[in-house]
């Protein structure tokens, strides 16, 4: 005959109550762990910046406000190939062109709707003459939607104003192109 096995569960003795259990029951150990973590970071140097007064350095590859560039002789670079318009996933670019007397094409209308633009940089990558670029300008605003609709003249003005910065950023990024 076999002996019966006991399936009884052993219950721990509840009368044995230590100081550690007492403190953890009041969650004081968690409180001290939190205070230790706070004290660890309280006296380190701060990494938060006060944004408008302090600015972080931007990468030369930062994609900000668009600009149209000109050649050194003052002629605009855009040859109206419309590759940027075709590749734009947000359909934010509108181009109209006409043929000049010398047989070359130039834009009569080059508009970018920054309300639609997703700043992907495809327009900049597709441009064969390096005409459309995204600058490192990140602080611009509009009080209405129409203020963020940039025409050809506005884009050329941005390019003319920031050409030294654009050229420096292009030179810094040249080995990666």
UniProtKB/Swiss-Prot annotation:
Key words, A-Z: 4Fe-4S, Cell inner membrane, Cell membrane, Iron, Iron-sulfur, Membrane, Metal-binding, NAD, Quinone, Repeat, Translocase, Ubiquinone
GO cellular component, one term: plasma membrane
Cofactor binding summary note: Binds 2 [4Fe-4S] clusters per subunit.
Lineage: superkingdom: Bacteria
Record domain 4Fe-4S ferredoxin-type: where: 69-98, 108-137
Any one GO molecular-function label of the UniProt entry: 4 iron, 4 sulfur cluster binding
Binding site for [4Fe-4S] cluster 2: 88, 117, 120, 123
Cofactor: [4Fe-4S] cluster
Family indicated by similarity: Belongs to the complex I 23 kDa subunit family.
Function: NDH-1 shuttles electrons from NADH, via FMN and iron-sulfur (Fe-S) centers, to quinones in the respiratory chain. The immediate electron acceptor for the enzyme in this species is believed to be ubiquinone. Couples the redox reaction to proton translocation (for every two electrons transferred, four hydrogen ions are translocated across the cytoplasmic membrane), and thus conserves the redox energy in a proton gradient.
Subunit structure: NDH-1 is composed of 14 different subunits. Subunits NuoA, H, J, K, L, M, N constitute the membrane sector of the complex.
Protein name in the entry: NADH-quinone oxidoreductase subunit I
Organism: Albidiferax ferrireducens (strain ATCC BAA-621 / DSM 15236 / T118) (Rhodoferax ferrireducens)
Gene: nuoI
């Amino acid at each position: 005959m076999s002996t019966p096995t006991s399936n009884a569960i052993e219950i721990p003795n509840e009368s044995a109550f230590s100081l550690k259990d007492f403190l953890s029951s009041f969650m004081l150990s968690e409180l001290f762990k939190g205070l230790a973590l706070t004290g660890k970071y309280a006296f380190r140097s701060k990494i938060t910046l006060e944004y408008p007064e302090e600015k972080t350095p931007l990468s030369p590859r930062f994609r900000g406000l668009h600009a149209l560039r000109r050649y050194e002789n003052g002629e605009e670079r855009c040859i109206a190939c419309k590759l940027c318009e075709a590749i734009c996933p947000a359909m934010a670019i509108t181009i109209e062109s006409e043929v000049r007397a010398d047989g070359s094409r130039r834009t009569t209308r080059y508009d970018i709707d920054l309300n639609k633009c997703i700043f992907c940089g495809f327009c900049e990558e597709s441009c064969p003459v390096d005409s459309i670029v995204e600058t490192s300008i990140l602080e611009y605003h509009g009080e209405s939607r129409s203020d963020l609709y940039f025409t050809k003249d506005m884009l050329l003005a941005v390019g003319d104003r920031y050409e030294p910065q654009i050229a420096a950023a292009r030179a810094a990024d040249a080995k990666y192109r």
